[in-house]
């Protein structure tokens, strides 16, 4: 009660791009016991999405998988401790270009963005993959199928803060509702496009009705 929860400090440039400084605060002191209780409240085959803002995310991934949960990782922010997790057993991995390079390390040196998906496919053949590329769009891959591209929905950016979180949240919600990966990504692209037209993070996330009303 005497300490602050997590804070994110964001600087926005004139063209809407951002730089982010994250302070975990009490988020970094959540106990393993409380996290496991949350997982125990889920039912088998439920989808659980993890980022990397809690202690021992790698251990939490393993615990979720042991409980039969479809586990999605959106490693924001990335750090090397995540490589200890059984990532090859994830249901889905959602990464931007920087995060993808973190997972691939030396393999990605000198590789253009277009080649990152092929490297991710080779490393995680049984995982649904999403590689977001900002204003360029996103690549997706379902295990056993060819990768595909979902173009970004073009909108005038005011503030890109929260666009990645909006994309990931809408994509995972669509998957949980039974939609296929391509459909989920198209919905997420529309949602994130709306979000960049507004200032702020959580306040910029559109309602579902707004996303459904957006004609592209």
Where are these regions (language model features)?
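A glycine-rich helix N-cap at a beta->alpha junction
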Residues: 1-2
């Amino acid at each position: 009660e005497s300490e602050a929860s997590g804070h994110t400090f964001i600087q926005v440039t004139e063209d809407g791009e951002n730089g982010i400084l994250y302070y975990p605060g009490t988020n970094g002191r959540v106990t393993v016991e409380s996290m496991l209780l949350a997982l125990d409240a889920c039912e088998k085959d439920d989808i659980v999405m993890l980022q990397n803002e809690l202690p021992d995310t790698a251990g939490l991934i393993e615990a979720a998988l042991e409980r039969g949960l479809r586990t999605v990782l959106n490693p924001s922010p990335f750090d090397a401790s995540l490589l200890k997790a059984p990532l090859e057993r994830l249901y889905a991995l959602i990464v931007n270009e920087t995060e993808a390079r973190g997972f691939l390390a030396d393999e990605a040196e000198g590789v253009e963005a277009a080649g990152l998906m092929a490297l991710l496919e080779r490393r995680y053949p049984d995982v649904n993959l999403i590689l977001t590329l900002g204003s360029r769009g996103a690549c997706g891959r379902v295990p056993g199928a060819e990768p595909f591209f979902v173009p970004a929905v073009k909108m005038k950016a005011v503030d890109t803060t929260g666009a990645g979180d909006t994309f990931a949240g809408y994509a995972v919600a669509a998957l949980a509702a039974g939609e296929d990966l391509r459909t989920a990504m198209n919905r997420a692209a529309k949602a994130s496009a709306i979000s960049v037209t507004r200032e702020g993070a959580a306040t910029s996330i559109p309602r579902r009705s707004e996303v459904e009303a957006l004609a592209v």
